[in-house]
């Protein structure tokens, strides 16, 4: 198709390599990406695919592979952005499914070490 970005030609190769190296899951189906076309804003963009990493290595491997294929990457949180940051024509990485641990809370220094999928409500419970 003439209007498709050039990186779409490499998407099948990217998907094949990604599924071989990923411990987590990924979904590049129309139904799977449809859930990530919107956030709390009025913007609508169809992602290239969605990755659900299980580990930090999954994050690193996904980012490295995206760089190799010159694919844009979007790390998505809760999809609550009202300015469109959570939607883009990119490989969306959703950490909210598996990377949700609160690893350490240091009350004295007012810091917390958390996985990237932790939401504020979960942190407040600790």
Language-model regions, residue ranges each:
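Noncatalytic alpha-helical scaffold of FAD-dependent oxidoreductases
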Residues: 1-126
């Amino acid at each position: 198709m003439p209007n498709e970005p050039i990186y779409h030609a490499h998407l099948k190769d990217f998907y094949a390599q990604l599924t071989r190296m990923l411990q987590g899951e990924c979904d590049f189906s129309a139904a799977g990406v449809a859930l990530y076309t919107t956030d709390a804003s009025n913007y609508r963009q169809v992602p290239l695919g969605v990755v659900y990493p299980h580990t930090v290595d999954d994050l690193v491997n996904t980012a490295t592979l995206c760089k190799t294929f010159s694919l844009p990457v979007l790390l998505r949180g809760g999809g609550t952005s009202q300015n469109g940051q959570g939607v883009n024509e990119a490989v969306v990485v959703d950490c909210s499914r598996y990377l949700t641990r609160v690893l350490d809370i240091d009350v004295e220094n007012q810091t917390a070490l958390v996985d990237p999928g932790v939401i504020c409500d979960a942190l407040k419970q600790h």
